[in-house]
């Protein structure tokens, strides 16, 4: 009987551990300050905004037309939506798509529209 109790206890502990792990994986990133180890460079990149997949898209970067880097942090519970170029709920954007979405999203970021008016 004691063996049955031990087996049941071990199974309950294992199920609890699995539940806790799943719960942690489903939580959105909740950074409240810029993390250590942000490593991004604008060299070789077109001007625009880039989600940092290394930080689950909660960190994002802007490369200016001059190649200057500025790094930003989305608020707790949000990530950078590379398609819309805004911080958004994680349910609205899959961070794994950021690299493939970057070129199209940044295509017109720093372009100026010229207006032609006729006299």
From Swiss-Prot:
Single GO term (MF): toxin activity
Organ and tissue specificity: Expressed by the venom gland.
Domain of life: Eukaryota
Disulfide topology: 74-87
Any GO CC annotation of this UniProt entry: extracellular region
Keywords: Chitin-binding, Disulfide bond, Secreted, Signal, Toxin
Localization: Secreted
A Pfam short name: CBM_14
Residue intervals of the Chitin-binding type-2 domain: 39-97
Segment forming the signal sequence: 1-22
PTM remark: Contains 3 disulfide bonds.
Glycoprotein keyword on record: no
Main location: secreted
Family named by the database record: Belongs to the scoloptoxin-01 family.
Protein name: U-scoloptoxin(01)-Er1a
């Amino acid at each position: 009987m004691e063996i049955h109790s031990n087996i049941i206890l071990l199974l309950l502990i294992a199920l609890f551990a699995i539940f806790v792990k799943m719960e942690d994986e489903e939580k959105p990133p909740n950074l409240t300050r810029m993390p250590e180890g942000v490593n991004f460079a604008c060299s070789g990149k077109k001007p625009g905004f880039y989600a940092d997949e290394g930080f689950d898209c909660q960190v994002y970067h802007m490369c200016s037309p001059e190649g200057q880097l500025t790094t930003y942090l989305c608020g707790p519970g949000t990530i950078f939506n590379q398609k819309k170029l805004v911080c958004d709920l994680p349910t609205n954007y899959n961070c794994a798509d950021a690299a493939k979405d970057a070129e199209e999203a940044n295509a017109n970021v720093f372009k100026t529209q010229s207006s032609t008016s006729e006299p």
